Each structure stands twice: as C-alpha cells, then as structure tokens.
A protein has these predicted regions:
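FAD-site-proximal beta/loop scaffold in flavoenzymes
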Residues: 366-383, 469-549
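N-terminal Rossmann-like FAD-binding beta1-loop-alpha1 element of flavoenzymes
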Residues: 218-246, 395-404
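Glycine-rich dinucleotide-binding loop and its adjacent helix/turn
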Residues: 261, 353-412, 437-441, 491-512
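Glycine-rich flavin
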Residues: 235-242, 247-382, 415-419, 425-426, ...
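Transmembrane helix boundary and interhelical junction motifs in multipass membrane proteins
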Residues: 37-66, 125-132, 153-159
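Mid-to-C-terminal Rossmann-like scaffold of FAD/NAD(P)H-dependent oxidoreductases
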Residues: 212-231, 239, 423-425, 436, ...
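Membrane-interfacial helix-loop-helix
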Residues: 2-36, 72, 76-132, 137-138, ...
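Core beta-strand elements of the Rossmann-like FAD/NAD(P) dinucleotide-binding domain
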Residues: 217-219, 339-348, 465-474, 512
Length: 601
C-alpha cells in the first residue's frame, strides 16, 4: 500500500483504535451517543451506504441493549426523513429511477396495507433505502410508516447489533473461529430465511383460520378442469398413489382436443394439401386442381378429434385411479368443493380452468353472429368474405388456412405488424407469404364498429385518422384469450386475480391460499398446451409435498411454434425480447434458401 497504509489494516491496529474509541465513549457518554445517533440518521436519511456497518459498530461500541435502542430509533427516524423527502421533493426522480420496483411495492401495499410494509422490514426483499424512497410515493400515513418500520426492523436490528458485540470480542485472528462469532454469523445468514418462513406461516394461518378444516379428507388433491393442465396434474398425482378427484363440466381434453390444437391443425393440414395442388407444376406435375366439399373437410376435422378422444377419456383416467366427476365445480372453501349437489373434501385444490376467447366490446358486435376459436368448428359452409380480427398465432393460422380454401380473407390487426411478439423480419416474411396466398393483411387498422346494412355486414375501421369500410360475410374474433376465473367460487373465497386477468400465483404456482395451486392458461403467462403440461408438474408436486419441498417453475427455455406456412418457431427469447430486457446477445443468421432440406421441399 502507498504511505504504508497496511499498518492500519492489522488486527492489532484495529483493536487499538477500538480501545481508544471505547475510552472516549466512557469519558464522553452523551456526546458519543449523540454524534453516533446523528450520524446514523444522516446516513439513512440521505440514503447513503453504510447503515449495516454502522449497526455492527453500534453493537461493538454500545453493547447489545443500548446499541439496539440507539440504532432502532436512529434508523427509523432516518428512514422516515427519507420517506418524507421522497414524498415531497423527489417524487418524479424516484418514479423514473425505480418505476418497476415501485409498481411491485404499490401492488403489495394495495393488497395487504401496512402488513406488507411490516414484512418488507422483517424480510428485506428490496434494499433498505429503496423501501424508504418508494414508500414515500404510496398513500401510507407518516405515523403508521414510522411505527410499522420501527417494529418491523427491531428483530433485524437485534441480530446485527449482536453480531457487532461478537466482533468486538476478537483479540486474535483465531478468535474469528470462536463459537460466539460463528453463531452470530449463522444467525445473520439464517435470519431472513427463518423470518420469511414465520411470515408465510402467519399469513397462511390468518387466511385459513376462518374455515373449518375437515378431520378427514376425501382426496389428497382435487383438480378443476380436464384440459392439458388438469389431465397431466391428475396423471402425476395418481402416479404417486395420491387420491385424486378430476372435475370437468364440459368435455374431457379441454380446448386443445376439442376447439384448439387438434381441430386447427387438422384444418391446416387439409388446406396445405390444397395449396400443394395449386403448386403442382413446381413439383413436376401437370397443372391440376382439387375439388372439395368444405362440409366433408369439417367432418374430417371432427373425425380426427374422435380418434384422439380415447387418450383423454373418462375411462382411461378412471383406469389410472382418478375419480372423474362430470359437472360444474363450486369451491365452497379451501377444503370443500360442491359438484352437482355433492360436496367433497380435499387437502389441496389445483385450478386448471383454462381460458376462453376474448371478444372486445366493439359497438355492434352483438348484432352479428361472430365466430371464435370455440365456435368456428361448427360451420359447414365456406365463408365467401371473411374477416379475421387479430394478428396473433390463432388469427394468422386461420387467415392463411381459409384463404387457401378460397375465402376472400381480410386480416385486421391494430398493431403495426402481425405476430407482434416475433422479430420484425419474421413478421414481414409471413406477411409477404400471406399476400401470395391471397390474404389482405391490414396492419395499423383499429376496429371501430360493426354495421348491418340490409343483407350486408361491414366492419368500419380507423386507419391513419380515416374510416375504412371492410365488407364481410363472417368474422373470426381472435384477439386473445382470457383466463376462466368466474363462476366457480374464486370471487367469494377471495383468491387473488392479477391485473392481466389470470389467477395470481407465486413462482411455485401457489395462490394466496397455501393449498390452492394453478396451472395452464388460468395461470399464464404462456397459453400453450405444452406449457400447461409443464406447469402441471410443478403445481402437482408442490401441492402434494408442501410444506417439505417445493420447486420454482422454470420458464427459461420455452419453445413455441405458430403453424403458418412457413411455420414460425423458436426456443426461449428472440432478438426483440433480448433488446426489451437489455440482455446482451449474439445474432447468427442462416438463410433457409441455403438449406438442402428447404430446397427439396
């Protein structure tokens, strides 16, 4: 070190300084406490680093009792001053600097009020200074903030002050391994984990204490919904010999089998065969054409569903040991579910209620018989003029498919590109292919009103400030899907719903009720069949093995594919998401026109 500074970093030097400070403290008791107290307040009020170190010093200098008293009041006063500065002087700066964190804290305060602040003080999920600044922008009263902060920080203060008292007792380097100091460090490390566990247990007991727990349960787990998520959850639970109830009010197999993956891919396959006929000369054939009956095409779609139905049937799952109930579930409390007038008791509940097509409240939509991914499969006549409202995966797949069958298709998308979650060049490629297939892709068009004029139906859209009329015979509404959360007791029970409309879950797919879990479309954030199955494993295992073991749901590598032609597929994030999340990446491009397989196809 320059200027021989290393001589001040030895244990002997530090002990000598400690003795001098201790001697000064004994001779100037009030002055030392006052200066330290004021310094601590300034550090915390100014949101400067060093509060933790000063807490350790307080333990070393003042001992456990007085160190705790001094730090408790100084830290709370400083935190309150920072809170007031944020509220009245730095509101805009804090909002812009910590907006994302502030949203989480505001959400917690909105749900749990002062108890949320108490848990943050007890288990600091955010830095001490950030809580002070962020809380200044919430509506919490100053006196409540002070009291809750002082009580919430007291346990942590005692732990840190105690660690400081142990550090002060080191006389030699071998003292670092003394039981007292090692114990202090162990307490420091375990304190957040222990307090988090205590808080979670307290929250759970506070939530469940108003419900009578059954002396004996009919089932270990009851699964509501027999779609992809519910079937996999039931299968896994039955595999480990749990007693399982599976409840379905409609059809086994859910959306994937009956109105989603299976029928759409069957229809896409038929349309693709027709497109090959139109390209016969590319493959060395004389120009040819197919004659088709759309009614028979739709019959084939239903026949494919029938072939797959046994895989998801009541008989199969009954054979696996699952007790399948056909009827509508009503959750009476965290332990009881009513089905067709019968009440069953269960230790855990897994919600796999799925999602339904979202129909936006566009004026006039109630005057037309619109189609969705649920009702599309009932039509038997090919629409002459078809509007597909929405540029997501479902909208894109159906727009190209019906265009290939011969419908005059207009695809309406409010965003500047179709497949908005994909990279721009991917969207551009699909758009160009759609145009070749005859799809009129209208991006940047906002649907304003459906109008019925005699026998004609027209969608009025806004584009660049002007109204544009798009006539149609049928319209498929495919602007997204909304989680099914109403009508089976969640509102009455108080299960929390997220702002996005899905059921609120933690990283372990647990709701605010410790024995109620969610998987599939009802949980989000992905609405894929394979993701629903993926989540089902976590929801089932976490529910059956709580509180002894739990697994955080892993979404780091999620594959998905949109079955347009060409297909759009990826695994994990793309370039667009990497840029949005400020993730460094390396981009490698390989043109498919250089691929042997692509050329042969």
């Amino acid at each position: 070190f320059t200027f021989d500074l290393q001589q001040y970093l030895t244990l002997e030097s530090m002990k000598q300084q400690q003795q001098q400070i201790a001697q000064f403290y004994q001779q100037n008791l009030a002055a030392t406490i006052g200066v330290f107290f004021l310094g601590y307040v300034v550090v915390t009020a100014a949101s400067l680093p060093g509060a933790a170190v000063m807490t350790l010093i307080a333990g070393a200098l003042f001992g456990l009792l007085w160190g705790t008293v001094i730090v408790s009041f100084a830290s709370t006063i400083g935190a309150t001053l920072a809170f007031l500065v944020s509220r009245f002087l730095l509101r805009d700066w804090v909002q812009s600097k910590f907006g994302d964190k502030l949203a989480l804290i505001n959400e917690g305060i909105e749900k749990e009020g002062e108890f949320y602040l108490f848990t943050l003080r007890l288990i600091p999920a955010f830095p001490f200074f950030l809580i002070n600044l962020a809380m200044g922008l919430t509506p919490i009263r100053t006196i409540k903030y002070y009291v809750v902060s002082q009580v919430g920080m007291l346990a942590g203060t005692i732990v840190y002050v105690f660690a400081g008292t142990q550090l002060a007792q080191i006389d030699s380097l071998s003292g670092i391994l003394s039981p007292g100091l090692l114990g202090a460090f162990v307490i420091l490390g375990l304190f957040p984990l222990i307090t988090k566990k205590i808080v979670n247990v307290f929250k759970a007991s506070r939530l469940l204490r108003k419900y009578k727990r059954p002396k004996k349960y009919d089932y270990n787990v009851a699964v509501i919904g027999a779609g992809s998520a519910g079937l996999v959850a039931s299968y896994i639970a039955a595999t480990v010999k749990a007693k399982v109830a599976l409840i379905e009010k409609h059809k086994m197999g859910g959306d994937c089998l009956n109105t989603g993956c299976v029928p759409s891919k069957a229809l896409i396959r038929s349309a693709k065969m027709l497109s090959y006929a139109k390209r016969a000369e590319e493959f060395g054939f004389n120009k040819g054409s197919f004659e088709f009956d759309f009614d028979k095409v739709m019959d084939r779609v239903q026949s494919v569903i029938k072939k797959i139905e046994p895989h998801d049937s009541i008989e199969r799952y009954t054979g696996l040991g699952v007790n399948v109930y056909e009827g509508e579930a009503k959750i009476l409390d965290p332990y009881r579910i009513s089905i067709n007038g019968e009440t069953i008791t269960t230790r855990n509940i897994i919600l796999a209620s799925g999602a339904s097509p979202f129909v936006p409240p566009i004026p006039g939509v109630d005057k037309i018989n619109y189609l969705t991914s649920d009702t599309l499969w009932d039509i038997r006549e090919l629409p002459k003029r078809l509007i597909v409202l929405g540029g997501g995966p479902i909208g894109c797949e159906m727009a190209q498919t019906f265009a290939r069958f011969g419908s005059d298709v207009s695809q309406i998308e409010m965003a500047p590109q179709i497949l908005i979650r994909e990279d721009q060049e991917v969207s551009d490629l699909v758009t160009e292919r759609f145009k070749k297939d005859g799809v009129n892709v209208l991006t940047g068009y906002k649907a304003k009103e459906f109008v019925v004029e005699g026998d004609d139906k027209v969608l009025i859209c806004e584009f660049e400030g002007k109204d544009v009329r798009v006539p149609f015979d049928e319209v498929i509404v495919a602007v997204g899907r909304r989680a099914n959360t109403k009508g089976f007791g969640l509102e009455e029970l108080g299960v929390e719903i997220s702002k996005g409309g899905t059921i609120e879950v933690d990283p372990y797919l647990q709701t605010n009720f410790p024995n109620i879990y969610v998987c599939g479309d009802a949980a989000g954030p992905y609405q894929f069949t394979h993701t629903a199955s993926h989540q089902a494993w976590y929801a089932t295992v976490n529910s059956l093995f709580r509180p002894f073991k739990k697994f955080r749901a892993d979404y780091s590598v999620i594959p998905w594919c949109t079955f347009t032609d060409p297909e759009v597929a990826r695994v994990g994030i793309n370039e667009k998401e990497a840029q949005e999340k400020n993730i460094s990446y390396e981009l490698t491009e390989f043109a498919m026109d250089e691929s042997d397989r692509a050329l042969t196809d």
